[in-house]
Amino acid sequence: MGMTHPPNNDLARRMAELARAAAAPRSVEQVLADVTAAAMELIPGTDTAGVLLIGKGGKFDSVAGTSDLPQRLDELQMLFNEGPCVEAALDELIVRTDDFRSEDRWSKYSPAVVEIGVLSGVSFKLYTADRTAGALNLFSFTPHAFDAESETTGVILAAHAAAAILASR
């Protein structure tokens, strides 16, 4: 049995790997898939992750999902014109929902995701100094899955994703 490293060592190691990988010629989709995979690995409680991109003319695009679920959740947000991923992409830096069963910010979206089995989530704006690219979105099948440490790690991953997106445009 090997030594277990403290979580921040894992974070530092994974971020270094992501940075090196991003330096290689790769598509944005590949970089974002690396980021969502890293989120699954580094942020306890994450059952699925994806990225919602804002395209030209404000069109949204769901990419880099670790399952089909993030795209379904993004589609519900488009349908209802409300939800945490859209809010993070457009307005807030971090949007955390501890329990969708008691979440009243999104009257249509919240009950729809509970029906699917998603009970908590956290979304991070992907932005640089002058432009917004979208949101990194993490979801869990358990309530209260995310905490301040989840947010810290997510912000770092989101910054990496944003840099990769903007470098490619």
Give the location of each predicted region.
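Regulatory sensory and allosteric helical modules in signal-transduction proteins
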Residues: 52-54, 62, 70-107, 111-119
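Short hydrophobic/aromatic beta-strand element in the GNAT-like acyltransferase core
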Residues: 48, 110, 123, 135
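Short beta-strand-to-loop transition segments that serve as allosteric relay/switch motifs
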Residues: 135-144
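Allosteric cytosolic regulatory segments
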Residues: 155-162
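Short hydrophobic beta-strand micro-motif common in sensory/regulatory domains
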Residues: 120-126
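Interdomain signal-transducing alpha-helical coiled-coil linkers
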Residues: 8-11, 147-154, 166-167
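Helix-loop-beta substructure at the N-terminus of cytosolic sensory domains
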Residues: 4-63, 72-74, 82
